[in-house]
Amino acid sequence: MITRRSWLKLMSLTLAGAPVIGSNGAANILRRNSFDSPLTLSPQNYYRYFTIFAEQERAVLGAQPQLPWQWFVDNIPFVDVPDKEIEQTYYFRWYSFQKHIRQTASGTVIDEFLDDVPWAGKFNSISAATGHHLREARWLRNQNHAESYAAFWFKPGSEPRRYSFWAADSVYAVYLATGNTVFMLKLFPKLIENYEAWECSNQDASGLFHQIDDRDVMEKSISGSGYRPSINSYMHGDAIAIARMASLANNPEVQRQYEDRKSVV
């Protein structure tokens, strides 16, 4: 029987993008949803959580929220957890997540705030949390949610560098879950351009990247601006991801360049 500790470890690593069961094994486990299998969980067994969430929302807002139950059935990975508090939290995350998915003229956007905020970009988009959003959206059965949102950031006016954002690492994480090489390689040149733009604006002769604390999504903090571990870890991760993409694209020159870059940061 799986323990609470081991389940938390598995789920944390899997949702964060670690290859805990090979490159696509974790994806296959979480995305398996063919209802003709006797081993498949029945979504109806978890419907009660969503009605509880909707009732709590109604109590706060004073209006009955829409409950798109079929969307959850069609999209989310259903899991059964021995600890029901963890299980309820898991399903609440999907309940709240779907509210942030917007369909726009530029494709799918997953916003950070339900209400429009003045510090956001077009369609209330904010690149700061996109890495987290893509790591969650990649588990949805409709791959377009993650892939369209990733592509959104490389369309005119989307400002992917308005905040620190591990773009290449996120796109590669989506690929690990979906196996869609075409999607990943289509964004490959844009991800290289994005990395080089960061080098021009935020890297100096030391090889390290500097960032303003607010733009690093840490608000105004005592640490202030400068060489921050966060932005440098993002760029290190992006260099690794681009090198791996280059390998899949049979581009040894770019692979070598970005393997060198990751060693500098």
Predicted segments with their positions:
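Active-site lining segments of carbohydrate-active enzymes
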Residues: S106-H132, Y175, M184, F188-A205, ...
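Substrate-binding groove/exosite segments of carbohydrate-active enzymes
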Residues: E55-K186, I192
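Conserved small/polar residues in nucleotide/adenosyl-binding loops
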Residues: V264-V265
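The feature captures the catalytic groove of carbohydrate-active enzymes
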Residues: P38-L39, Q44-R58, G157-F165, E199-E259
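C-terminal segment of N-terminal export signals and the immediately downstream linker at the start
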Residues: I21-T40
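N-terminal secretory signal peptides and thylakoid transit peptides that target proteins
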Residues: M1-L15
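Generic, well-ordered alpha-helical scaffold segments in large soluble proteins
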Residues: T14, F92, S96, H100, ...
